């Protein structure tokens, strides 16, 4: 009798755990607008092509890695102006966007590093349809920054 009771309690706890896990996974589903930010992008800076960045998800957060350096750079160039763990790291392959979290229909709360000057900025990211992405980097408040529009690479 006692063994059956324990088995029943274990089944109830296991069922609760599975249900809670499924509920948590469903809660982390991203809207299509947020999902559109994941992909392969041509960076456009001052109306000129400026390298490629792949954006991807890790733990529900958006990150971005340089997959092609800007014109005039070589794949062996490093970020000599960066600080911390990015100091003297190859620009090609560098994770320049980190820890962007969903905030309504945008990604916010993350940081972006400009490998040209080594500076780190707060950032916001939103999509303009499926094939354009806007990245706003700023210091302090969003008004003190600038926005780049990136174009999806098929």
Residue ranges and their predicted role:
Residues 28-40:
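N-terminal helix-cap/turn-to-beta initiation motif at the start of protein domains
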Residues 57, 102, 127-128, 152:
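Generic beta-strand structural signal
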Residues 11-21:
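Bacterial N-terminal signal peptides
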Residues 38, 43-45, 49-116, 120-121:
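Central antiparallel beta-sheet cores of small beta-barrel/beta-sandwich binding domains
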Residues 81-87, 134-141:
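Short aromatic-glycine motifs in intrinsically disordered, low-complexity regions
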Residues 130-132, 139-154:
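Edge beta-strand at a domain terminus
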């Amino acid at each position: 009798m006692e063994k059956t009771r324990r088995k029943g309690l274990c089944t109830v706890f296991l069922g609760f755990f599975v249900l809670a896990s499924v509920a948590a996974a469903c809660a982390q589903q991203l809207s299509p607008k947020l999902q559109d930010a994941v992909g392969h992008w041509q960076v456009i800076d001052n109306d000129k092509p400026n390298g490629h960045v792949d954006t991807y998800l890790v733990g529900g957060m958006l990150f971005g890695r340089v997959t092609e350096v800007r014109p005039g750079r070589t794949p062996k160039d490093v970020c000599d102006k960066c600080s911390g763990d990015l100091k003297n790291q190859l620009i090609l392959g560098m994770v320049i966007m980190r820890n962007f979290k969903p905030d309504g229909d945008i990604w916010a709360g993350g940081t972006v590093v400009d490998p040209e000057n080594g500076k780190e900025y707060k950032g916001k990211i939103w999509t303009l349809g499926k094939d354009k992405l806007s990245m706003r980097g700023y210091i302090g408040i969003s008004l003190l920054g600038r926005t780049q529009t990136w174009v999806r690479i098929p």
